[in-house]
Amino acid sequence: MFKNKNLKLNKFYSLKLLSKLLFLNIILLLIFIYIEKNNNNRIKVCVCTVVKRENKYIKEFVEHYKSYKVDKIFIYDNNDINGETFDDILYEHLKSNYVKILNYRGKEAKQLDKFQNCYNKNKKYYDWLIFYDVDEYINLRNLTNIKDFLRLNQFKKCKSIYLNWVIHTDNNLLYYDNRTLKQRFPKKYMNKKYCNGKTIIRGNINGIKMETTHLLDRKMERCNGFGKIFNYLISLKRKIRI
C-alpha cells in the first residue's frame, strides 16, 4: 500500500515537472518568435551623401529615407563658405540627431574622398551604408522598410548591392515650383538598355577603396536587386533592375 502511494506521488510530481518544462519551452518559443519578428530593429542602416546647393530638395530626400526606416543620414556639406546652410530647413532632424552635418564648406569637391571617410568612420556601427546623391531615391516594390529588403535571404552572402536607376523625364516643366520631386516628375524615361545605378555596401569590411561613385570598390563582388552575383560590364548589355 505504501509503495503504491509512493508511485502515485512520483507520477504526480513527474507530470507536474513535465508540465512546467512544457510551459517553459512554450515561453521560450514565444520569446524566440518575438525576437525574430523584431529582428529588423537590430539592423542599422545609414545614408552618406555629399551636398552642394540642394536646399530645395534636401528635406524631401531626408524624409524619404526616414520613411524607409534608415537610422541615420550623414550629410557632407560642400556648400560655399557663405552659401546656404541646413540650420532652418533641417532643424527638426538636426535637433533629433537624425541628421549629422560634416563641414566641408568651401573645400575642393572630391566625392569619393568623402565616401571613403563616411565608410571608414561608420562601418563598425552600421550593417549597410547607402551612398546616394540627393536626387536618388530608393523605391522598393511592396516594401516600406529598407531593412526588410536587406534582410531577404537572397542578400545573405552579398557584400554590396547594385540597384539600377529609373530615370524620370522633365515632364515638360520649364520652371521650379514648390511641389515635391515625386509630384513634379512622375513620368519615367523608359529606356530598357539603361543600366547605370548606385551601390549599397555592407559594413565592417576591411580594405574597401572608393574608386567610382557608381560601383564604389571596383574589385568588390556585387549582387543585383534580386541577390544574383553579376558582372557590371555584362550588365551594360543586359539590364538588371528591381
Q: Where are the language model's segments positioned?
A:
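Short beta-strand/loop segment that forms part of the nucleotide-sugar
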Residues: 71-80, 103-105
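Catalytic-site signature of metal-activated, phosphate-bearing donor transferases
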Residues: 111-116, 140-242
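Active-site-proximal specificity loops/subdomain of glycosyltransferases
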Residues: 86-128
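Short beta-strand-to-loop acidic/aromatic patch adjacent to the donor-nucleotide binding site
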Residues: 126-139
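Cell-envelope/extracellular polymer assembly enzymes that use nucleotide-activated donors
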Residues: 44-46
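Short, acidic, metal-binding catalytic loop of nucleotide-sugar glycosyltransferases
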Residues: 63-72
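Active-site beta-to-alpha loop of glycosyltransferases that engages the nucleotide-sugar donor
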Residues: 49-63, 79
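N-terminal signal-anchor transmembrane helix specifying type II single-pass membrane topology
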Residues: 8-37
